Amino acid sequence: MAELACFCYPHLENDSYKFIPFNSLAIKCMLTAKVDKKDLDKFYNSIIYGIAPPPQFKKRYNTNDNSRGMNFETQMFTKVATLICEALNSLKITQIDVASVLSRVVSVRHLENLVLRKENHQDILFHSKDLLIKSVLIAIGQSKEIETTATAEGGKIVFQNAAFTMWKLTYLDHQLMPILDQNFIEYKVTLNEDKPISDGHVKELVAELRWQYNKFAVITHGKGHYRVVKYSSVANHADRVYATFKNNIKSGIASDFTLLDQRIIWQNWYAFTSSMKQGNTLEVCRKLLFQKMKQEPNPFRGLSTDRKMDEVSQVGI
């Protein structure tokens, strides 16, 4: 995760701003600079290489002292920064909004995946500039639309029906901010269209999840799609989701946290996010993740058996 101010800076033209990507030498200069505390939140002028990010964001970049930041000297950083600027420059952003836009925290890996989709000549984003810009605006929180299958960050498709697409995320192969844990496995489920979904299509997805992914929890980050994650990583997701939710409220960022379909979401996660939306503390909400829940009447009871019998019936055909 990183603020948009880590990728670009605003330049006033007439009554609105044009956004310009940083270059790696300017960032490198900023990382070595001694800056007064009162200037830490201001864009840094490297004199030779142009404008650099505010020094308060030093920890967002990978250095000898900080291996958890972005690999900003890669080609991918330039590609992501340029793509962000293209999307922001498609909007008219004025003095009133520029600070809140640049302070927004975005998913670095999501944006790298959009670059990879853009560069894949078999992908719809390679052929449609409008859809690409729309996808980026959704990713950086400048659109109220949810991330659907067409505008998704992408990955490897492992399941699809008329209503849903399930992606295996490919963060292990990334340049900008790769996942270093080689045991990382995570999936995302997007809606093919933002419209009501039939019970039959929900049933197909639930059957797939129970049959193939019963060691994973289905959760949501509140952005209109599902995540399928290892149970061991649920607490980490909870901390991040709670922190983002509270930060958005503090920053005055209007964002609806969508709970999604309770029949699909892991029961404990649904309780956690419902409690969070009610304004409870992280400690109170977190307890719900590890609490034994009363089983709700399940409209899809026995689906795993149905799926198993259906697959057995195909043998010999």
From Swiss-Prot:
Transmembrane segments: none annotated. Residues 205-241 are annotated as: RNA-binding. It comes from Rotavirus A (strain RVA/Human/Japan/AU-1/1982/G3P3[9]) (RV-A). Its EC number is 3.6.4.-. This is Non-structural protein 2. GO terms for cellular component: host cell cytoplasm. The lineage of its organism: Viruses, Riboviria, Orthornavirae, Duplornaviricota, Resentoviricetes. The keyword Lyase does not apply. One of its GO terms (molecular function) is nucleoside diphosphate kinase activity. It is found in: Host cytoplasm.
